[in-house]
Amino acid sequence: MANKPLMLMNGGMYHDNLDAVGLYVEKGVEAQKISTKGGWGNFHLLPNGVFWGKDGRLGVTETKTYIKRGIKPDFATQSGPMLVIEGKLHRRFLVDSDSRKIRNGVGISRDGKTIHFAISHRAVTFWEFGTLFRDQLKTPNALFLDGTVSSIQTAGTKRGGWRQIGPIISVSAKRPN
C-alpha cells in the first residue's frame, strides 16, 4: 500500500491528451521518449532539462548531458527551460521581461541531499524565478516545470486550479523497512 502523499505538484508540460511533452519515466518504465526536437514555447527554450531519480539519488540535468550520461532512472520528467545551469541563469532570461506568470520548478542542493520544489505566490518572470533557485536556495541546477497551470498541494495548502493535468510529482514519506 502506498504512503499518503506529503506533496503533489504538476510535474511538467503535456499535450492535449495529457501525455508528457518530453521524457516521462515512472517505476523504471519509459512512457514518453526524451525530446530533442525544436519548437515553440517554454519547453523548447533551450536548454531544457530532466528531473530524475535513480536508487535514491536525485538530479536536475540539462537534456543533452542527461542523454550523454545514459541515465536509466526510476522516474523522470523532462521540461523546460532550465532555470539554473551549473550556477548560472539561463542565457535567454531577461531582467526586464514583461512575461509574468505563476511558475513552478525544482532544484537539488549541491550535495544532492535536499530537493527544493517551489511555486511562486504571484506572477513572476523567469529571471526572478531563476534567481530564487540560484541565490536563495543555492541550487546549481534548477528546472522550470510549468507556468499557467502551476499547482501544489501539501498538508494544509492547496494552490492552483486542480483540473486534469499531465505529469504529477508525488512526494511521500520513506516507508519503514
Where do the PLM segments sit?
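Gly/Ser/Thr/Pro-rich low-complexity, intrinsically disordered segments
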Residues: 1-177
